[in-house]
């Protein structure tokens, strides 16, 4: 990837990360969420993030975290979010950032990396497959909680 530099994510990258997020999702409503998520990850001892820069501009970012044992898992890495600006997709930037994240995990003794993806996000499923991800033993479940109280009898 000529002209692309990978480095640790910094707080000053947040405006460019928000711009990338907006270019992909087209939703301003999530700007505050992405800003807070990045700030939270920068504060976490086990959180890590990298950006890809081209000519001083952030063109991609990846955020991960090492999580402790739980749900029957060993201490493991989690790839929380990866995004590349649409103008720079297909150049191997996401792949390079993921490899850097995996190396970070590996150096810390992590053997397994987990992530979640929408089942119909074919492009992301293909991307994760190219990185060697496969189905896990988990499935994601959701329950919508409305205004009604849930009652149980004893």
PLM regions: where:
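Acetyl-CoA-dependent GNAT
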Residues: 11-12, 19-74, 80, 144
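A short, internal acetyl-CoA/4′-phosphopantetheine-binding micro-motif in the GNAT/acyltransferase core
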Residues: 79-89, 117
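Conserved acetyl-CoA-binding loop-helix of GNAT-fold acetyltransferases
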Residues: 84, 90-103, 130
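Conserved active-site alpha-helix within GNAT-family acetyltransferase domains
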Residues: 95, 107, 119-137
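Conserved GNAT acetyl-CoA-binding A-motif
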Residues: 105-117
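A short beta-loop-alpha structural element at the N-terminal edge
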Residues: 3-17
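Terminal substrate-recognition subdomain of acyl/acetyltransferases
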Residues: 129-154
